[in-house]
Amino acid sequence: MFGTATRPSATRALLLGSGELGKEVAIELQRFGIEVIAADRYPNAPAMQVAHKAHVLDMLDGNALRALVTLVKPDLIIPEIEAIATDTLAQLEQEGVKVVPNARATQLTMNREGIRRLAAEELGLPTSPYRFAQSKEEFIAAVEAIGLPCVVKPVMSSSGKGQSVLRDLAKLDESWTYAQEGGRAGRGKVIVEGFVPFEYEITLLTVRAVDGIHFCDPIGHRQEDGDYRESWQPQAMSTLALARSKEVAAKVVGALGGYGLFGVELFIRGDEVWFSEVSPRPHDTGMVTLISQDLSEFALHVRAILGLPIGTITQYGPSASAVVLRDGHSQDIRYQGIGAALALVSGAQLRLFGKPEIAGRRRLGVALARGQQCEEAVEKAKAVAARVEVIC
């Protein structure tokens, strides 16, 4: 049973993290009349602009997080970012507050150490070789053990921040410093991964719901500077590789438990599959589903966490997303050329996230398009994104 938003009967959802992905989740929640309370570390975040209420706090502060939960009395807490006081979430869950998919999944996936140890050491899934390092000395030893080239990442970061490929020992200090600066919680532990000779990466959106486990078609994507620039669906792959990918994804989400959508990241080479990472929430590369499917990743996540059946997911054919990424400094961003951008491609769509400021490089929107093939859809989406003029 759902109540009516803002009324005594309201079913309340507290979003912890209010970026562009949280914004789409908030919109989907409101389609079911759910009252949405959006929280983040800065005011006027994208999801706050469409929520019923908004709160600003440091979500790594357990006392502040507990105080907010006491104030808003949510029926469910929906973590949308990694930088959250997960120990407090676990305590709240033990006290009867519903965390989706569950507090353990949030704890394990908020840092790469927890999920890598689950996947490789408990589930026995194929992964790249890895070592963790807390100090500069441990980092040097880890690089020596793994060998070059290797991938260096903070154990806690998002959108590629702090990630680098280390190919030359002369760049060792630079790689360590970059990882320390890119961590969501500041300086801390890093993971050093052996370089997997993969042909491509996919995101396999996997939904665990009341009516079982469901898979979206695989999503391919291109990364640059550790962040996604374009994604497309479906990614072409062999029947065996897809079957193995689904097997890996099902094992991971089954071990994490709870209902929701999970973004499972995998490396593929021929028929071989390696597990990379998983997020227990919508994935940035999955924004392509806003145009590629009848139920976007956000709609699927909301259905699952509300205990509703998924049924059949219908895919519309080759589709793509391309980010609107700009550099600048402004607290009053303006956009022009929207009409010209949309006129370029019949059926194209555009989402501007409404981010309140820019300081350096920031993802401000996403263009969406379909085509006869994925390559065509990507070029269309890139053309639309490039035509948007950002005035800082």
UniProtKB/Swiss-Prot annotation:
Q: Which GO terms describe its biological process?
A: 'de novo' IMP biosynthetic process
- Which GO cellular component terms are attached? cytosol
- Positions bound to N(1)-(5-phospho-beta-D-ribosyl)glycinamide: 20-21, 80, 284, 355, 362-363
Sequence ranges assigned to domain ATP-grasp in this UniProt record = 117-306
Annotated EC: 6.3.1.21
Q: What does this protein do?
A: Involved in the de novo purine biosynthesis. Catalyzes the transfer of formate to 5-phospho-ribosyl-glycinamide (GAR), producing 5-phospho-ribosyl-N-formylglycinamide (FGAR). Formate is provided by PurU via hydrolysis of 10-formyl-tetrahydrofolate.
The name this protein carries in UniProt is Formate-dependent phosphoribosylglycinamide formyltransferase
Species per Swiss-Prot/TrEMBL record: Aeromonas salmonicida (strain A449)
